[in-house]
């Protein structure tokens, strides 16, 4: 194994020689061996990926919407760059038929996985104001439940995760309706959807979720994928206590690994790392068996230094972590820096080249394998345990009730 000191001392020589220090010159572990290691102990049919976005541009009357600011390259260049990155990561080649092309690529990538389990497909409701009125001018994108349910029919590996904004006048009725259609969870991104999880307006929705066994998958921490400049505090994980106290099972997406939020337990309301606030909730015994952390994005370059090692070290909480990919995010190459992960001691140098190939060939597979070959505090590549990828039925009780 190459040590960090050897790497740094050789960097100058390699740079002068015009070589790239990407690990390509070292044979390392083959992708096949990495997959074999990743699958050890995994029940292929119990595998679960709880975080896959359904996106599009409304082609084919899907009802999907994208705010014009996301596609206006001249007036909103940063949003345009972000949007193009998602398109490229999704493997879309037909820009005249984006919605169907996106789902065709996702289906092929899911079905190419060595696992034979379930991937939740997520709808995404429009922004509504506190009066219950839709606000399309504030909606960055939306994916109707009807389109999501139609997409689920494309593969037996898909299962439905609906999205119902709690401020809607018909929120309770809509939640019952999606539960009747087989939804196993509800997706919220409070920062982008303008939802305050602590608002009394959410209580009717919480009652229905608890009654129907609909798990709430809610973003935690700051949001960077969807522009949300003025509403970041809505992602404060402490605001999800209202859902927990109402009896809802809650999965906090990304384990609130990005950004800072107000410490609502502190009289001075000091800004604190959102991940630390989430971990405080995980350590609260009253939420054991009801609160879970989802691990998508915890290895991205802008949060891996604290979230990755922090979660790997808390082996006492691993049974309360669940796997999610946040697809198509794993396909955006700059977001996952394998050299950075090696520098942090989270992967072995000899695994780096094989991981890079897996991400290029199938970002979903690369994401799964990376999480399974991570190095723990002792330096051994033990990865997140199989329980994270094959969670117990109590996390998604509605999924457990669905016919095999």
Residue ranges and their predicted role:
Residues 6-27:
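N-terminal export signals
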Residues 21-50:
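C-terminal segment of N-terminal export signals and the immediately downstream linker at the start
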Residues 29-31, 118, 123-233:
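Active-site gating/metal-coordination segments in enzymes
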Residues 47-57, 216-221, 252-255:
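Histidine-centered catalytic micro-motifs
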Residues 48-50, 122, 161-162, 187, ...:
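Active-site neighborhood of phospho(di)ester-bond hydrolases with catalytic His/Asp-centered motifs
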Residues 62-134, 141-151:
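Alpha-helical scaffold segments that flank or form the walls of functional sites
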